[in-house]
C-alpha cells in the first residue's frame, strides 16, 4: 500500500487574485539547476525486527524516488527503534532482570557501523539514486549510540553523526557522541548535516554546523509536540538554511504487546490504535516559510522543492557566522578529535614523545 504523499512545489507560485501567494519572494526566479526535491519520511520502525525495518525503509525510499526526490531523510532511530515509554525497569540504585533483558533485545536490534545493514543502505541509495540520511541505533561493542548515517546517490557511505547529548533516560541506554562526528558534507545538491532531537536546542552545536556552511540541515527527532515546529523555524531563520525534520508516527500496536513492552504510566489507558507519537514532520525554508507539513495525521512522505537560491536571499540581511557575527566579542572552540576511554601507545611512540 502506498504512503500518504504530501508534496509542496514552491518553485512556480500560482497566481491568486492577481497576486503571488508569497509576493515578497519570486520563487520561480531561481535557476532550475538549484532546485532540489527533498522528502522527509514519517513512519514507524518495525520494533525489534531490524530486517523488516530495512525492508520497510526500502519501500519508502522507492516511493520517494518515484516521486522525484533527490534527498530522503528518515527519523531518529528508525533502524533499531526509539524505545518510547520504556523504562528498562530503571530506578536510582536499582535494576531488574527484565530490564537487563530488555536492553539485551534492544542491543540485538542495533547495527554495527560499518556492517551488513550499512552496506544494504548504501545499495538502496545507489539503486534509487538518492542522497539518504538515516537515523539508526549504532552498536559499538556493548555501547549504543543514537546515530545518523549519510549516503550519496552513488551508494557511497559518507559518514555519520552521533548524538552528542542524549536526553533524560536516553542517557542510561545510549552513549555520548564527541566532536569527531559533527560533519557537514559538501555534495552536488548542497551542504548536508544533521542534529538529532533535543541537541538541536544546543546553540554551540548549531553554530558549529553554521560555521561549516550547512545548507540543508536535517533534524531527525522523536519530539512530536506542536512547539517543535517553532524550534525548527527558528533554526532555519538563524542558520539561513533549509531544515528537514523527520519524526516517526507510531500507534501502540507498532510496539510489542504487554508484558513484553510496557508504556510506563499509561499502558492501562492505551488501545492498539492509540497514537503514541504524532509525527509533526516538516520542511522549512531559510526564510522561515513552512514548505511542507507539519503532518500529525499518520505515516506519510512529506516532500518539497528546495530553491537553493533562497539561502543567499535569507543571508542578505542575516549571516550568523558572517556579517552578523561579532568574533571580537564571542568565540567558539570545538574539539574535533575522537575522545577514547583508553589509548594505547607503543614504546617507540613514547620514546619519540620524550625527545
Curated annotation (Swiss-Prot):
E.C. number(s) listed in UniProt: 3.5.5.1, 3.5.5.4, 4.2.1.65
GO CC list: cytosol; plasma membrane
Effect of substituting residue 197 to A: Loss of nitrilase activity and 95% reduction of the nitrile hydratase activity
Active site: 76 (proton acceptor), 163 (proton donor), 197 (nucleophile)
Organism field: Arabidopsis thaliana (Mouse-ear cress)
Protein name: Bifunctional nitrilase/nitrile hydratase NIT4
Subcellular locations according to the entry: Cell membrane
Lineage, uppermost ranks: Eukaryota, Viridiplantae, Streptophyta, Embryophyta, Tracheophyta
Keyword Protein transport attributed: no
Gene: NIT4
pH relationship of activity: Optimum pH is 7-9 for both activities.
Pfam family of the protein (one): CN_hydrolase
Domain CN hydrolase: 36-308
Keyword Acetylation: yes
Functional summary from the UniProt entry: Highly specific for beta-cyano-L-alanine (Ala(CN)). Low activity with 3-phenylpropionitrile (PPN) or allylcyanide and no activity with indole-3-acetonitrile. Not associated with auxin production but may be involved in cyanide detoxification.
Keywords of this entry: Acetylation, Cell membrane, Hydrolase, Lyase, Membrane
Residue(s) carrying N-acetylserine: 2
Annotated InterPro entries: C-N_Hydrolase, C-N_Hydrolase_sf, Nitrilase/CN_hydratase_CS, Nitrilases_CHs
Reactions catalysed: a nitrile + 2 H2O = a carboxylate + NH4(+); 3-cyano-L-alanine + 2 H2O = L-aspartate + NH4(+); L-asparagine = 3-cyano-L-alanine + H2O
A GO term, aspect molecular function: cyanoalanine nitrilase activity
Temperature remarks: Optimum temperature for both activities is 40 degrees Celsius.
Gene3D superfamilies per UniProt: Carbon-nitrogen hydrolase
UniProt main location, coarse: membrane
Amino acid at each position: 500500500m502506498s504512503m500518504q504523499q504530501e508534496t509542496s512545489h514552491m518553485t512556480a507560485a500560482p497566481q491568486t487574485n492577481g497576486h503571488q501567494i508569497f509576493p515578497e519572494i519570486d520563487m520561480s526566479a531561481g535557476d532550475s539547476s538549484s532546485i532540489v526535491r527533498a522528502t522527509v519520511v514519517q513512519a514507524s520502525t518495525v520494533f525489534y525486527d531490524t530486517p523488516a525495518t530495512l525492508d520497510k525503509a526500502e519501500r519508502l525510499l522507492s516511493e520517494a524516488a518515484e516521486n522525484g526526490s533527490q534527498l530522503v531523510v528518515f527519523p531518529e532511530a528508525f533502524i533499531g527503534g526509539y524505545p518510547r515509554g520504556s523504562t528498562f525497569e530503571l530506578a536510582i540504585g536499582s535494576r531488574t532482570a527484565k530490564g537487563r533483558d530488555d536492553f539485551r533485545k534492544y542491543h540485538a536490534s542495533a547495527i554495527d557501523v560499518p556492517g551488513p545493514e550499512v552496506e544494504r543502505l548504501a545499495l538502496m541509495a545507489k539503486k534509487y539514486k538518492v542522497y539518504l540520511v538515516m537515523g539508526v541505533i549504532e552498536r559499538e561493542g556493548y555501547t549504543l549510540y543514537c546515530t545518523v548515517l549519510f549516503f550519496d546517490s552513488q551508494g557511497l557511505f559518507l559518514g555519520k553523526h552521533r548524538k552528542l547529548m542524549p536526553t533524560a533516560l536516553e542517557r542510561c541506554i545510549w552513549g555520548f557522541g564527541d566532536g569527531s562526528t559533527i560533519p557537514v558534507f559538501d555534495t552536488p545538491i548542497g551542504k548536508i548535516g544533521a542534529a538529532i532531537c533535543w541537541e538541536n536546542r544546543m546553540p554551540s552545536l548549531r553554530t558549529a554546523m553554521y560555521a561549516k556552511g550547512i545548507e540543508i540541515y536535517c533534524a531527525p527527532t522523536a519530539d512530536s509536540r506542536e512547539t517543535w515546529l517553532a524550534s525548527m523555524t527558528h533554526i532555519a531563520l538563524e542558520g539561513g538554511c533549509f531544515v528537514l525534520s523527520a519524526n516517526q508516527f507510531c500507534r501502540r500496536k507498532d510496539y510489542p504487546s504487554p508484558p513484553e513492552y510496557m508504556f510506563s504510566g499509561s499502558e492501562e489507558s492505551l488501545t492498539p490504535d492509540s497514537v503514541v507519537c504524532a509525527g509533526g514532520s516538516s520542511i522549512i525554508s531559510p526564510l522561515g516559510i513552512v514548505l511542507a507539513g507539519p503532518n500529525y495525521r499518520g505515516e506519510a512522505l512529506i516532500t518539497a522543492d528546495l530553491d537553493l537560491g533562497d539561502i543567499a536571499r535569507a543571508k542578505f540581511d542575516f549571516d550568523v557566522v558572517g556579517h552578523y557575527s561579532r568574533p571580537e566579542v564571542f568565540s567558539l572552540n570545538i574539539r574535533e578529535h575522537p575522545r577514547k576511554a583508553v589509548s594505547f601507545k607503543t614504546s617507540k611512540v613514547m620514546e619519540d614523545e620524550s625527545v
